[in-house]
Amino acid sequence: MSTKNAKPKKEAQRRPSRKAKVKATLGEFDLRDYRNVEVLKRFLSETGKILPRRRTGLSGKEQRILAKTIKRARILGLLPFTEKLVRK
């Protein structure tokens, strides 16, 4: 029972599982497309804020993707950061 010549055991390596990509589409529109301003404006309030999930009906992951897309469009100047305050 000598351990000098014993080969070390190889541990079984597990292949990392792939995360399923979220289908971030709204009908035929892709929510990741920051150039489609007409679709993105549907998810903004009158003052330019991003609407919450309970109003948009998107899942959590889809809402995060949408928020990132809207912010990207704002930085590129395709969407305004704010709208004028509407007083009634």
From Swiss-Prot:
<dbReference type="InterPro" id="IPR036870">
    <property type="entry name" value="Ribosomal_bS18_sf"/>
</dbReference>
<keyword id="KW-0687">Ribonucleoprotein</keyword>
<dbReference type="GO" id="GO:0003735">
    <property type="term" value="F:structural constituent of ribosome"/>
</dbReference>
<keyword id="KW-0694">RNA-binding</keyword>
<feature type="region of interest" description="Disordered">
    <location>
        <begin position="1"/>
        <end position="22"/>
    </location>
</feature>
<dbReference type="GO" id="GO:0070181">
    <property type="term" value="F:small ribosomal subunit rRNA binding"/>
</dbReference>
<dbReference type="GO" id="GO:0006412">
    <property type="term" value="P:translation"/>
</dbReference>
<comment type="similarity">
    <text>Belongs to the bacterial ribosomal protein bS18 family.</text>
</comment>
<dbReference type="GO" id="GO:0005840">
    <property type="term" value="C:ribosome"/>
</dbReference>
<keyword id="KW-0689">Ribosomal protein</keyword>
<dbReference type="GO" id="GO:1990904">
    <property type="term" value="C:ribonucleoprotein complex"/>
</dbReference>
<comment type="function">
    <text>Binds as a heterodimer with protein bS6 to the central domain of the 16S rRNA, where it helps stabilize the platform of the 30S subunit.</text>
</comment>
<protein>
    <recommendedName>
        <fullName>Small ribosomal subunit protein bS18</fullName>
    </recommendedName>
</protein>
<comment type="subunit">
    <text>Part of the 30S ribosomal subunit. Forms a tight heterodimer with protein bS6.</text>
</comment>
<dbReference type="Pfam" id="PF01084">
    <property type="entry name" value="Ribosomal_S18"/>
</dbReference>
<dbReference type="InterPro" id="IPR018275">
    <property type="entry name" value="Ribosomal_bS18_CS"/>
</dbReference>
<dbReference type="InterPro" id="IPR001648">
    <property type="entry name" value="Ribosomal_bS18"/>
</dbReference>
<keyword id="KW-0699">rRNA-binding</keyword>
